[in-house]
Each structure stands twice: as C-alpha cells, then as structure tokens.
C-alpha cells in the first residue's frame, strides 16, 4: 500500500506542474463559456445539452464509434435529435415513456458500443438523462430539437476532423451491425441492460415526481 500511496503522490505532483494547471484552467474556462453561450442562445432549459455537447466533443477527439466515418457522423446527429423527440413523447404517459425510452436508449447504445472499451455511449446516455430531467412544453420542442441538432452537428464536425485521416476499414456500417445482431454478444446484452436500467430509473423518477405534484 505504501507503493500505491507513493505512485498517487507522484501523479498529483505531475499534475500540479504550471503548464498542466494553466491548460486545465483554460479548458475549464472554455467549457463554462461554451455552456453559458449555449444556454443564452437556446434557453436555460437546454443549457445541459451544451454540457453534453462539449463533453462529447472533448471525448471524440480521441474516441471512435467503431462505425464508418460518414455513418458515425450521421448517427451522432440523428441520435441527438431522436433523443429529443423520444423524451418529449415519453412525457405523455409514464408507461408509454418506459417503452419509448427503452427502445431509444437500446438503439443508440447498440449503435455506439461495438467497441465497449471506448465507452462512447456515455455522452449520449448523459444527454438523454439530462433532457428527460428538464421537461419542456410542446411549444418549446422546436427550440430543443434545434439545440440538439446544433450540438450533434458540432460533435460531428469535431469527429470528422479528428478521424477523417484514420483508417476505418475495420469499422462496421449500420446495416452490417443490424444484420449481425446477436443476443448472445456483449454489445447486445450491455445495450439491453443499459436501456432497461435507465428506463426503469426514469419511470420511477416520473412516478415519484407526479406523486409530489
């Protein structure tokens, strides 16, 4: 355990170097400015979409979706818009919401978890939970969808410039992923468990919320 503490101390000292501290500070300031501007443009109800967008942009500089480049870009944008539509439909009725949430989360999770170790699903699930937790009226839906589309487009732009020169010959396209879908694979089972867990949590949250109204 002494060696573990020593390694931890060395790691802390390494991260306390002036250059690292300054770069981290600049990054934090940039994130705050981005989220603030996002909220100013699209409204406070959509500021968390900005949080998800900047999180995904930073993540996808290095992380890939295991999809062909063009399909990864399309999947990113459409997934964000799909989550906005699904969460609004889910608000009609808790049990309808459970079904809609389950299907949407499963589809999105499955498409981006071919390479499990990348955890590429995180910003998508985070976004779904955030927008589900900040309900809006139907009249506000167009603005939310625009916010989600812009967020997805910004992520796609970062993804394109970060991965356009990388070899994606071993990556799948969506049709191949659907054709080879197998309930015994880790990808399928993980997506199923993720969709079930998040959908149940959202159902319980909506029931508790209605009980306190």
Task: Place the predicted regions along the sequence by residue.
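Alpha-helical transmembrane segments and their membrane-interface boundaries
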Residues: 1-212
């Amino acid at each position: 355990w002494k060696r573990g503490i020593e390694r931890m101390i060395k790691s802390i000292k390494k991260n306390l170097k002036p250059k690292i501290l300054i770069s981290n500070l600049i990054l934090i300031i940039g994130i705050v400015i981005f989220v603030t501007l996002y909220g100013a443009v699209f409204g406070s109800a959509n500021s968390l979409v900005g949080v998800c967008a900047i999180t995904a942009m930073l993540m996808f500089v290095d992380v890939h979706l295991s999809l062909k480049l063009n399909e990864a870009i399309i999947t990113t944008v459409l997934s964000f818009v799909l989550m906005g539509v699904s969460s609004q439909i889910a608000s009609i009725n808790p049990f309808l919401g459970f079904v809609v949430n389950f299907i949407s989360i499963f589809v999105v999770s499955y498409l981006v978890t071919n390479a499990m170790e990348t955890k590429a699903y995180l910003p998508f699930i985070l976004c779904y939970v955030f927008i589900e937790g900040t309900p809006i009226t139907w009249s506000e839906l167009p603005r939310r969808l625009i916010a989600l589309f812009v967020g997805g487009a910004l992520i796609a732009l970062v993804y394109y410039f970060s991965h356009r020169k990388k070899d994606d010959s071993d990556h799948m396209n969506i049709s191949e992923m659907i054709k080879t879908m197998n309930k015994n694979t880790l990808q399928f089972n993980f997506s199923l468990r993720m969709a079930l867990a998040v959908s149940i949590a959202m159902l319980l949250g909506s029931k508790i919320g209605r009980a306190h109204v």
